[in-house]
């Protein structure tokens, strides 16, 4: 008889965002006359920009001709896209990255969940909290985090980000082997300065730890002093893997394209003390388990680096950031504490009157018809907080704010 992976049984009953959808659908069934505005799941709403659409059409036409048809592509990604990534995302910031250090994929979610396959199941994990749930769930599936006891994973090192520490995590007091950082941060919308990020790089060096750095929202940084890549920090190539995505940068949530950077000098040890290069290991993993992102999608991704593409995606980014700033300003004017919305499209709200995250969710759903994200879904230190996003339309964002103001009797 076949046996299941017992660690899957340790996962919570349903994926967090599924629970949100279930509550909303229940409300809609009992209140069919009510309109719902969603400022919850971080999906984009603006269409793909013209430069991307043209590239998709052109690449599709190529696939219809014998002379330009493409079958299986390179698992790393096509050179035409990798070259644009290097020139625009790294060389422009005085960071040297080589072509074989970039692995194009169909999504950061997949990569950041799969990367833990490279590490020993007994490695200790430190994760900022609150945080994107996939970091935790993927490690639960591998058995690294122990048991969930009163909302706390028994073997996980939590790095709290709360109002008390200005949402900047402190270095852990116990040794981690793997450290998850996400900046600009989802869900809090906060960032780390170069000095603050340097502290983490130096700490990882001292501890022999690996930083998994999720930079999916770097395109939303407006402060010129904030690093867009962890590799802007001296020595980071020795301790960090970086994850980037075109989903929020260029609206690719429905196309799926991303990339992961693993420097060739990045090493980890076996339990016997033998050094292994993680770039080689990930390459072996990808060539075994992955056939590459499609040619058509990679051509579309390359198009965002053209002058027209850059101009067009910046218009979309600025559109979303305008929405986020509207939310941030309105919430703070209500006398409610809120962070984010300046270097990220997320606004992180301290719930008023000490309401729980889910109670505040229900209040806004029932009284305003606005759907946000309960902070507790991002981890125990998200309890008492709530996330709203700038990814809606300008009209819906303003309408949602008006409804929230009325619901809170402001």
Curated annotation (Swiss-Prot):
The keyword Transferase applies. Its EC number is 2.6.1.83. Substrate binds at residues 15, 42, 109, 132, 186, 291, 387. Its cofactor is pyridoxal 5'-phosphate. Homodimer. Involved in the synthesis of meso-diaminopimelate (m-DAP or DL-DAP), required for both lysine and peptidoglycan biosynthesis. Catalyzes the direct conversion of tetrahydrodipicolinate to LL-diaminopimelate. This is LL-diaminopimelate aminotransferase. It comes from Lawsonia intracellularis (strain PHE/MN1-00).
